[in-house]
């Protein structure tokens, strides 16, 4: 897979991937098969994904609430808050990448409206979020009542610097994400994962019981709860990260 070269010096300066291993690779794999065009990466983090995509011929712009974290050279950057108006013109982009961003937002509904505004007709939105609906997370919720580790006030101050923007404050599952996309005229065209989780196979008896139970559901109930998708290998058996690709119609 062709990518731009990231030097050791850049890595030492913090020019690193903040997403889980496999996420950027899957996004790049998808975009390599698409026509080159204008791309907005928001939130961009260090800018490493845009640096790689720029090396593949995409015309990239970067945006993030944290300007100090941006490390990429020769790529335009604007500071912006996804809870508010993203500072770019309407119908400007062929692609938007939003890697591990929505779960940090107080207002993901606003962000989705902004994505719709910024994309050209036929433009594609590539989103990654934590996969809270894989079988491992579902079992964790069953036994603990929480999808993630609870955050104490001490942890909030020491680990997250008392900033909500650093936390996962929206534990968004696939059904809500699908609703947000479709209510803004964005149709899902592909689901993917970062990488498989081998230890999922230890939960095979539970997986088999759930699938057998749902097999007896009436057709209308299966459709109403989107079981074809929520019990798919990408979601139910998926990795830590769910990648959703949608198109503006």
Cite the ranges covered by each PLM segment.
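A short alpha-helix capping/helix-coil boundary motif
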Residues: 7, 27-30, 93-95, 155-159, ...
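Polar low-complexity intrinsically disordered regions
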Residues: 1-3, 59-61, 187-189, 246-249
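Conserved class I S-adenosyl-L-methionine
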Residues: 1-34
């Amino acid at each position: 897979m062709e990518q731009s070269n990231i030097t050791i010096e850049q890595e030492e300066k913090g020019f690193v991937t903040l997403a889980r291993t496999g996420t950027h690779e899957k996004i790049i794999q998808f975009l390599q098969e698409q026509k080159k065009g204008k791309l907005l990466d928001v939130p961009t983090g260090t800018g490493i994904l845009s640096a790689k995509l720029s090396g593949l011929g995409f015309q990239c712009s970067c945006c993030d609430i944290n300007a100090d974290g941006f490390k990429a050279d020769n790529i335009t950057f604007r500071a912006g808050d996804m809870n508010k108006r993203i500072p770019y013109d309407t119908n400007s982009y062929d692609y938007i990448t939003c890697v591990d961003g929505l779960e940090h937002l107080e207002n993901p509904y606003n962000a989705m409206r902004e994505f719709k505004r910024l994309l050209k007709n036929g433009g594609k939105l590539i989103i990654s979020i934590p996969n809270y609906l894989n079988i491992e997370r579902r079992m964790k919720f069953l036994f603990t009542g929480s999808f993630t580790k609870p955050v104490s006030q001490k942890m909030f101050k020491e680990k997250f610097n008392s900033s909500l923007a650093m936390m996962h404050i929206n534990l968004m599952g696939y059904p809500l994400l699908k609703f947000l996309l479709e209510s803004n005229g964005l149709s899902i065209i592909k689901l993917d994962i970062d990488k498989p989780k081998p230890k999922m196979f230890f939960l095979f008896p539970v997986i088999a019981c759930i699938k057998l139970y749902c097999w007896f559901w009436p057709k209308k109930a299966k459709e109403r709860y989107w079981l074809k998708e929520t019990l798919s290998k990408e979601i139910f058996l998926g990795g830590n990260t769910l990648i959703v690709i949608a198109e503006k119609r």
